[in-house]
Regions:
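Short acidic/glycine-rich loops and adjacent helix/strand connectors
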Residues: 1-178
């Protein structure tokens, strides 16, 4: 559903287009990679391994906010810190989830998506957590988009799903040269 909605509202439908979705996995699917080429919509990958949305919502909950309504507040807190203040937290997030070609690889130490993050984020300032989380999101999304761009030689992207509501990440992605 996310992929088709995003594609059909795309003003560049005639171009080779990668349609990527990323969300919290409410339907059991956390991400998809789709290609629209010469009038055909081709599903390339569907996975439950892209935990960016789940990590973001769980971290929002850990920070004492509603994960269904306040993720934008965490995104809004991110600019109020400096990378030197959150580098250790960023490394923790980066080690929890890696990009693996068109998919993602979850750290095998993670057994519970909530308590693993709660335990490891304990004692850190909320703004530093927010800054690290936002930076992590942008880094992993960029890697994913780059891999899709290289594999399919595509420059036109449509990005939908809950993670795509992160306007800071969208701005960051729109500034990249894929």
């Amino acid at each position: 559903c996310h992929a088709f909605y995003g594609f059909y509202t795309n003003p560049k439908k005639s171009q080779l287009t990668a349609v990527l979705t990323s969300d919290g996995g409410g339907d059991g699917v956390y991400n998809t990679v789709n290609i629209f080429k010469k009038g055909k919509f081709i599903s390339i990958n569907r996975s439950n391994k892209n935990w960016i949305g789940k990590i973001y919502s769980n971290t929002t909950l850990i920070l004492g906010m509603n994960p269904f309504r306040h993720v934008y507040k965490v995104m809004g807190l991110a600019p109020y810190t400096q990378k030197t203040n959150y580098q250790k937290i960023l490394n923790f997030f980066l080690n929890s989830l890696k990009v693996d070609k068109l998919d993602f690889k979850i750290n095998s130490k993670i057994k519970d998506k909530y308590f693993y993050f709660k335990k490891n984020l304990e004692g850190y300032r909320f703004d530093n957590i927010a800054g690290a989380l936002q930076n992590f999101t942008e880094i992993r999304l960029k890697e994913w988009f780059e891999n899709v761009s290289k594999k399919f030689k595509v420059k036109n992207f449509v990005f939908t799903g809950g993670v795509a509501n992160n306007v800071k990440a969208n701005k960051f992605l729109s500034e990249q040269k894929f």
